[in-house]
Amino acid sequence: MARMKARSAKGKRVAKDTWKSKVWYDIYTPQSFGGDVIGQTPANDPANLIGRISEISLRDLTNEHSKHMTRMYFKVDGVSGNNATSQFVGHDTTREYLKSQVRRRRSKINAIVEVRTKDGFKVRVKALVLTAVRARDHHKTEIRVRMEQIIKEMAKETPFAEFVHAMLMGGLGSKIYGDCKKMFPLKRVEIFKSEVIEFGKAAEAPVEEAAAEEVVEEAAAETQE
């Protein structure tokens, strides 16, 4: 019995610590968003980084406390050394914040519209209008139609980076508010969510390690499938 136990112990495999082989990479926003570091992520192969999503609050990115409820998402699209580049792929707003804005005897009007920016990016935009008093159905319809028109017009006339800035920093919401308040008393406008569906011609080319260029491109293709 003792010999059998010794043999069993000798043949036992030791689990490999994969963390020791991992390297930490800094994730950077696109230059159009300041080129700032927004986080770190580990990987044992640069190709494994492609397609990873990094999240950061707009408050942390801009140092504006009033933007704490907005979360931005960036997808890694390239690697150079220990640095990973990324593309903005969308944003959302915390559910708690949106619920806190809804009051009794007010109407909530939602608009979901897909637009294409001046430089070819296709974006799905979700906007919300809260009226100051309860609105009738025909007022809701008129406001929703005008919301969609404003969003489409701004996207068509604006490059992607500027359009995203308008969504996140209030420019688009202010435009909707200014136009629609002439139709009915409003309380607030929120561009509460966006999603990039297609990248346009102005998308920044990812920077990749020369030695890993082919494998990184293959990983990117697999991610899109």
Swiss-Prot record:
It holds the Pfam family Ribosomal_S3Ae. The keyword Ribosomal protein applies. InterPro entries: Ribosomal_eS1, Ribosomal_eS1_arc, Ribosomal_eS1_CS. GO terms for cellular component: ribonucleoprotein complex; ribosome. GO terms for molecular function: structural constituent of ribosome. Belongs to the eukaryotic ribosomal protein eS1 family. This is Small ribosomal subunit protein eS1. It comes from Methanococcus maripaludis (strain DSM 14266 / JCM 13030 / NBRC 101832 / S2 / LL).
